[in-house]
Regions:
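Short alpha-helical donor nucleotide-sugar binding micro-motif in glycosyltransferases
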Residues: 310-315
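N-terminal subdomain of nucleotide-sugar transferases
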Residues: 1-73
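Donor nucleotide-sugar binding/catalytic pocket of nucleotide-sugar-dependent glycosyltransferases
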Residues: 162, 177-221
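Conserved donor-binding/catalytic core segment of Leloir-type glycosyltransferases
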Residues: 231-248, 254-257
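Short hydrophobic beta-strand element within catalytic cores of glycosyltransferases
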Residues: 340-343
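Conserved acidic donor-binding segment of nucleotide-sugar-dependent glycosyltransferases
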Residues: 355-369, 378-383
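Nucleotide-activated donor-binding/catalytic signature segment of Leloir-type glycosyltransferases, i.e.
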Residues: 281-302
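Aromatic "clamp/platform" in nucleotide-sugar-dependent glycosyltransferases that forms part
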Residues: 323
Length: 419
């Protein structure tokens, strides 16, 4: 149930321009507005709405010449797109044609058109600014803007900490000391930030990324398999996300899958991969070279929630072999659909599966294909055990990641720092 909003938050996602990230996954701005769901930002929008907080998304883009407003249809949120400044365009062009040190960092700082942003923040009646990442140039300039406009500035952690350039290092420390608060889901990252930047603990809040567990629920398994043309007696491990081989540990997953199939000859085993990305061509080559059994790959970005639920509902176990994450939503989607999870201990996973098997999953060391194979094999070999873990996973999703639970926590933290 939504509450009448009495607070408005400006949400600024990571990336210099809208097209920098979305072009790499084949998502046009029209598709973004009409169809895209599932990412952390939409979870925040939905969760905050349940707590009476309205969210306005802000992007910069080279595809508009004046501030333009749109509606994100699935959430109803306003999307305000600001034109990139001429100076940023010039620096961006130069970066493509030279290797001048520090120019890329300068471009990142210039990517946020502060004058236009200030005007649109006032127009929307925004009470606070929330940036996707605090170790990024946009956060630094937003803290400055917040001081000038007397607006509190917060930031989340979604996995994007970067190496500091000579320009960024002093700016970052100053911005973190002067921001209002940080929202971090993982205890490991909280400890790192406290150690590296010396921030007072009260400035940090441990709040998980939310998920609409009412919408993310399992379909009938047999019907899902029928739609996908998968035999009812096949055993399926599923993964979905961006195809980035090293970061997402897909090389580890392929090696683990090879072990699993070799140890279980004669069984109909399927590895269902859903997603695309910058390493798609390389992954195709690896799969062909390794001559792996039963790999089914939907090489596209799937933004249809019903279709994604169908893929998850057809599976027996979900796996996340990542080497690095921020706080991944994908395994929570699988848990909400009643799937047990086998995941590498990347940041966020020890928090999501805090109770281990009691939370509905198994955690293995990162980069360890043998350990991943053993854990996945254990789940695939034990039907009763896998069903029990799936029930626990669903309970964990409902109790810890629902919109209502997270929305209340977010509102309390944002309001506790209002002046």
């Amino acid at each position: 149930m939504n509450v009448q909003p009495d607070l408005t938050i400006a949400l600024l996602p990571w990336g210099d321009l809208f097209e920098d990230f979305h072009d790499t996954i084949g998502v046009s701005f029209e598709t973004f507005c009409k169809e895209l769901t599932g990412s952390w930002q939409f979870g925040y929008i939905d969760a905050l709405r349940t707590a009476g907080v309205r969210t306005v998304l802000f992007f910069a883009s080279e595809h508009v010449s004046t501030p333009s407003r749109f509606t994100h249809v699935p959430t109803g949120a306003t999307v305000c797109v600001l034109p990139a400044s001429p100076l940023h365009r010039a620096v961006r062009y130069t970066v493509k044609h030279t290797s001048f040190p520090g120019l890329k960092t300068l471009g990142a700082y210039l990517s946020t058109p502060l004058g236009l942003l200030a005007r649109e923040l006032r127009r929307e009646g925004c009470n606070a600014i929330l940036c996707q990442e605090y170790e990024y140039a946009r956060f630094d300039v937003c803290v400055l803007l917040g001081k000038l406009m007397r607006l509190p500035v917060f930031a989340t952690f979604q996995g994007g900490h970067q190496q500091l350039s000579r320009i960024e290092a002093p700016m970052r420390s100053l911005a973190l000391q002067n921001c209002t608060g940080l929202i971090i889901a993982t205890q490991t990252e909280i400890d790192r930030v406290l150690t590296d930047y010396g921030l007072p603990p009260a400035k940090l809040a441990r709040i998980f990324n939310p998920l609409d567990v009412k919408l993310w629920c399992a379909l009938d398994r047999d019907e899902a398999r029928g739609q996908l043309g998968i035999p009812l007696d096949a055993q399926i491990a599923v993964w979905h996300g961006r195809i980035e081989i090293n970061r997402k540990g897909l090389d580890v997953l392929l090696e683990a899958w090879k072990h699993i199939c070799c140890e279980r000859p004669g069984r109909d085993l399927r590895l269902l991969l859903v997603g695309t990305g910058s390493d798609a061509d390389e992954l195709h080559q690896r799969i062909a070279t390794m001559q792996l059994q039963g790999v089914m790959w939907v090489d596209e970005f799937v933004n249809d929630r019903t279709k994604m639920r169908c893929y998850l509902s057809a599976a027996d176990v979900y796996t996340l072999p990542s080497r690095h994450e921020g706080f991944p939503v994908a395994p929570i989607e699988a848990m909400a659909c009643g799937l047990p999870v086998v995941a590498a201990d990347a940041p966020g996973i020890p928090d999501i599966l805090e109770g281990g098997e009691a939370s509905g999953g198994l955690v293995v060391p990162r980069g360890d294909a043998k350990a991943l194979a053993l854990a996945l094999g254990r789940i695939l070999d034990d039907e009763a055990g896998r069903h029990e873990l799936g029930k626990r996973a669903r309970c964990r999703a409902e109790d810890s990641f629902s919109l209502q639970v997270i929305g209340k926590q977010l509102r309390e933290f944002l309001l506790s720092h209002q002046t």
